[in-house]
Amino acid sequence: MNHELLKSIIYDQHEVIRNADIVSRPSYTFEADANYVLVGLRRAGKSTLLYKIVRNLIAGGVSWDQIIYINFEDERLSEFRKEDFNDILSVQSELSSAQGYFFFDEIQIVPGWEKFCRRMADARERVYVTGSNASMLSREIATTLGGRYLTKYVTPYNFDEYLTALDIPHDSRALYQTKANGRIRSHCADYLQYGGFPEALRYTARREYISSVYQKILLGDIIARNGIRNDYAIRILMKKLAESVKSEISYTKLHGILKSIGISVGKESIIDYIQYAKDAYLIFSIQNFYARFAERESNPKYYFSDNGLLNLFLDDKNTSLLENAVAVCLTQKYPADVYYLKSPKTGIDIDFYAPSAKQVIQVAYSIQGDAYERETGNLKKFAATVTEPHSYIIVTYEEETTIETPDVKIQVVPLMKFLLTK
C-alpha cells in the first residue's frame, strides 16, 4: 500500500476529528489500557465515540502524529487487503517514534482483519475497532481475538442523550417547570417519531435522512453482504415485521403472510433474512419468559433498533411507536434480560418483563375506557402468581397517576418520564 496515500488518509481524518461536533455520552466509559471493539447500528455514533477518545488523548498530551485513524469505507482504500495491514504499522513508525494509538473504523470490510488485530493486541498496542455487523462477534472471531478486546454495543441516542445534544434542560427541576416541561414534551414527541440517530438532529428533513440510513443498512449491510438475490422478499419481510410490532409472530406465520400476497420465498430463507437483519442491528427480538427454553425462539416479538426506522413503515403509528420506544429503552438498560409474558393457562399477557429489575410493564397510549381493565387486569393476574415484590408500571403517552388496589400498586407513567428514569 502506498505510504503517502495512507498518510494523506490519516491527516484528512485528523482534520475531520478536529472539526467534529461531539456530544458527551457519559454512559460509555473506556479503560485507558484496554482495547475495544465497538459494534452497533450504522450511524449510531460509534465513530463519534472514537473521536472523543482521540480528543481526550490529545488533551492528555498525546501528539496527533501518534493517532492513526483509518476509516475503511474511504474509497481510496477500496483495494486494501489484509497483506496491507503491515503498511499501517510502517507509516505509524514513520510519523512518530512514540507509542501509536490505532483507530480502525468499519474494519470488517477487510477479510482477515481479526488476525491483524490479535497481533496488535499481543504487541500491546492500543487499538479501537468499530463495525456495523454482528459477524464481528462471531464465535470464530471471538476465538481469534481471545479476550484481548472489550466489547461496547453502541446505540443511537437515548432520550437523555437526545435532549443533551439539543441543549434542552431536563433535570428533575425542569420536569416541574411549566415551560421547560412543555419543551421536553415537544421533543419527546419528535423522539417518538424520529428516534435518536445523532446526525438526524442536524436536518429539518429527518425522515429523508433516516430513509437513506435504512437503505444503506438494507442494501449494503444485509442484501449485498449476504448475497441476497430476492431483495423484494426481504423488503416486504421488513415491512411485515414492522406491522407486527406489539405481537409475537412465528417464522411459519411470516411465511404464510408472504405467501398469501404472492411472494415466493422459503421458510428457511425467512429465518436467514431475519438473522441478517439482526446481525446488522436493524431489529432485535424478545422471547416469552414463560416458554420452555427450547421454544423461546419460536414465537418472538420483533422490534426495530430505532423508532425512526420503524416509523418509515407504519400507517397506524401511535401505539406501535410507543411500545417500540419502551422496548429500546429497556434493552439498553437491561441487555439480554427483557422478555414478554404470555400464558394461555393463566390468561396473563404482559408486554415487558425485566426479571433482574423485577419490573413488569404494560404499554398503552391511554388507559381510558376498556384499556384500563385490560392493562391493570393483566398486572393483577401476574401479581397473584409471585411472592416477591415487583414494580408494576403502565407506560402511556402522557397520562400519569397511581392506581392502588388491595392486590397491587401500579404506577402509570408518561413516556417522557419513563425514558428519563435512570
Map each language-model feature to its residues.
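Conserved P-loop NTPase "ATPase switch" module shared by AAA+ and STAND
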Residues: 96-113
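Short regulatory helix/loop adjacent to the ATP-binding pocket of P-loop NTPases
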Residues: 135-151, 166-167
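Structural recognition of the conserved hydrophobic beta-strand(s) that form the central parallel beta-sheet
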Residues: 126-132, 153
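Conserved glycine(s) of the Walker
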Residues: 45
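A cross-kingdom feature that marks ATP-driven nucleic-acid transaction machinery
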Residues: 1-21, 32-34, 39, 48, ...
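Loop/turn-to-beta-strand initiation segments
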Residues: 98-101, 123-128
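Short glycine-rich substrate-engagement loop in P-loop NTPases that contacts/grips substrate
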Residues: 68-97
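Interdomain hinge/linker elements that couple catalytic modules in large macromolecular machines
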Residues: 2-11, 160-328, 338-344
